[in-house]
Amino acid sequence: MATQIVEDTIKSKGRRTDVGDILKPLNSEYGKVAPGWGTTVLMGIFMALFAVFLVIILEIYNASVLLDGISVSWASLV
């Protein structure tokens, strides 16, 4: 038979640790959703700042000394 009935066994609850006691309050809000937009606007601001950061890094890379004297036109690849 593919399925099998297993007798109920007593499951251990696990050890209690100091770190677990400290972190327990952080998990008490698990599954709850704040009404409204919450921190969505803040997340959008940080995403925009990160995009600006990436553009700045790209500009620095494109103006790099490593690329001086290297032709970057598609015609040079033919």
UniProtKB/Swiss-Prot annotation:
The name this protein goes by in its record: Photosystem II reaction center protein H
Plastid recorded as keyword: yes
Family to which this protein belongs: Belongs to the PsbH family.
Phosphothreonine modifications at: T3
Membrane-spanning segments: 41-61
Compartment(s) of residence: Plastid, Chloroplast thylakoid membrane
General function of this protein: One of the components of the core complex of photosystem II (PSII), required for its stability and/or assembly. PSII is a light-driven water:plastoquinone oxidoreductase that uses light energy to abstract electrons from H(2)O, generating O(2) and a proton gradient subsequently used for ATP formation. It consists of a core antenna complex that captures photons, and an electron transfer chain that converts photonic excitation into a charge separation.
Pfam families in alphabetical order: PsbH
Keywords associated with the record: Chloroplast, Membrane, Phosphoprotein, Photosynthesis, Photosystem II, Plastid, Thylakoid, Transmembrane, Transmembrane helix
GO biological process, one term: protein stabilization
Membrane topology type: Single-pass membrane protein
Major localization class: plastid
PTM characteristics: Phosphorylation is a light-dependent reaction catalyzed by a membrane-bound kinase; phosphorylation occurs on Thr residue(s) in the N-terminus of the protein.
GO cellular component: chloroplast thylakoid membrane; photosystem II
Assembly mode: PSII is composed of 1 copy each of membrane proteins PsbA, PsbB, PsbC, PsbD, PsbE, PsbF, PsbH, PsbI, PsbJ, PsbK, PsbL, PsbM, PsbT, PsbX, PsbY, PsbZ, Psb30/Ycf12, at least 3 peripheral proteins of the oxygen-evolving complex and a large number of cofactors. It forms dimeric complexes.
Molecular function via GO: phosphate ion binding
Tree of life domain: Eukaryota
